[in-house]
Amino acid sequence: MARSRLWRPLKICGVELKHRIGMPSLSRLRASDDHTATPMMKEYYGQRSQVAGTLIITEAGIISPGAGGFPNAPGIWRDDQVAAWKTITDEVHRNGCFIICQLIHVGRAANPETAEAEGIELVSSSAIPYDEAAPVPRALTTDEIERIVHDFATAAENAIRAGFDGVELHGANGYLIDSFTQDVSNIRADEYGGSVENRSRLVYEVMRAVGDAIGPQRVGLRLSPWSTFQGMRMRDPVPQFSDVITKAKELSLSYIHLVEPRVTNNEDAEHAVHETLDFAIDLWTGPILLAGGYRPDNVQRVLDDAYPNKDIMVMFGRAFVANPDLVFRIKNSLPLNAYHRSTFYTVKNPAGYIDYPFSEQFLHRLQNLVVAGSKKKKKKKEEEEEEEEEQ
């Protein structure tokens, strides 16, 4: 495994990663009631940035007061939210790692109870609910769409102020951008619907506005072409998502982040043999992040055998939840902690969030590094004292 491309550097958003195992965006609902990042979140991300050179993508950051709809999800539209995130990015950078902020407008997928409590109106590309039991959203006007594009750009600027190395646009899983991209949710008859080109318009405008605001090489895009989560999945997503990816390439985005068809949200899913991401991987010439059901025993095959000529990075979600030292464990072929699905979304609860143990081997290595660092510091101090005496 040590010779695998998994351990080769990769440049994303202008920073050089030391390996190709990353942590994707994972909603955990541990922010405050007013959507501000908490000290508990700082500890969580700090734990998972203990192996230098690792890339972390945060849980989705809500771009504006009306863009949310999940309880205790963090936002990035207020100055105090920016300041709270800065404590987290500083911690991650102190550990020698890198961190990207995912940006989201939840759209029609907002939790109805949370939306009502916070005065959020459920909106989407069209007045189509994501399932029969869900509320019917209101179709956005073109003026409102323009404002949302602006909100994404402002949130991206806030993310850079907060110390993030870049941003990732959430264009997957049935949230607002995805609801415009696919014809199962978009039946508009204006410039934002009715054709492949028009359905790509919102994501294109967001990519362009965010790229203009912070530079396209600080921007990535997450897509889930085959996912059925939250009422999605076109009959044939290939032409539509090929168009989106082509536009992302034209705008010189840093990377694309693709969700495998074998997962739906945090669950494994059945999929047909022809449902692959190959069309997207073939189109894109830059770094590609792949997420969905990867295990330590199959990642080497993906990088070294399946896509040997592509700059692939593999993202581990559930495994990173339960293993703060995941990269170390994979590199040293150590067993993984089991994750507890029941604690994934327990609001403001430290259980199942910051209490997963590091491996004994990692803690021993960390202790040795601390001892070595202390000896080096002591030796340097002695040398400086000797120089002062000679003078």
Residue positions per predicted region:
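Flavin-dependent oxidoreductase catalytic cores
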Residues: 1-377, 389-391
